[in-house]
């Protein structure tokens, strides 16, 4: 029991001796990060009207409305994805019922 208490004390001492990674002075001001796209994509980019639509139907609509889209991925909501940006790709995130739950967009 004493060793557990000692471990807890050491943990709190170590934890309070470090600043958090996100800590900064208020006088530093807000930091703005500007993300740059290497290129602009042509055609329709977003389909907010497809929320709640079955993913297979949504896939067909996207391919019909933007012929430059050659890669429509259907993924379960919360699935890990790569962060690279491709003008020919749209990801459809669905739920277990097979309906679109996030706004499909070129990514």
From Swiss-Prot:
InterPro entries the record matches: Prot_inh_pot1, Prot_inh_pot1_sf
Chain positions of site Reactive bond: 83-84
Annotated TM spans: none
PROSITE patterns documented for this protein: POTATO_INHIBITOR
Presence of keyword NAD: no
First and last residue of the signal peptide: 1-23
GO molecular function annotation: serine-type endopeptidase inhibitor activity
Keywords for the protein's UniProt record, in alphabetical order: Protease inhibitor, Serine protease inhibitor, Signal
One GO BP annotation of this record: response to wounding
Disulphide bridges, residue numbers: none
Residues cleaved off as propeptide: 24-36
Protein's job: Inhibits both chymotrypsin and trypsin.
Family: Belongs to the protease inhibitor I13 (potato type I serine protease inhibitor) family.
Additional facts recorded: Mechanical damage (i.e. insect chewing) to this plant results in the systemic release of a factor from the wound site. Within the leaves it induces the cytoplasmic synthesis of proteinase inhibitors I and II.
Protein name (Swiss-Prot/TrEMBL): Wound-induced proteinase inhibitor 1
Source organism of the structure: Solanum tuberosum
């Amino acid at each position: 029991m004493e060793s557990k208490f000692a471990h807890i004390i050491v943990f709190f001492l170590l934890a309070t001796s470090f600043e958090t990674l996100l800590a900064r002075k208020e006088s530093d001001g807000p930091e703005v990060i500007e993300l740059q796209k290497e290129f602009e994509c042509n055609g329709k980019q977003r389909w907010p009207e497809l929320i709640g639509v079955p993913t297979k139907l949504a896939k067909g609509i996207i391919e019909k409305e933007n012929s430059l889209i050659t890669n429509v991925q259907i993924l379960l909501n919360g699935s890990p994805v790569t962060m690279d940006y491709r003008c020919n790709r749209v990801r459809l995130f669905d739920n277990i019922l097979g309906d679109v739950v996030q706004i499909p967009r070129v990514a």
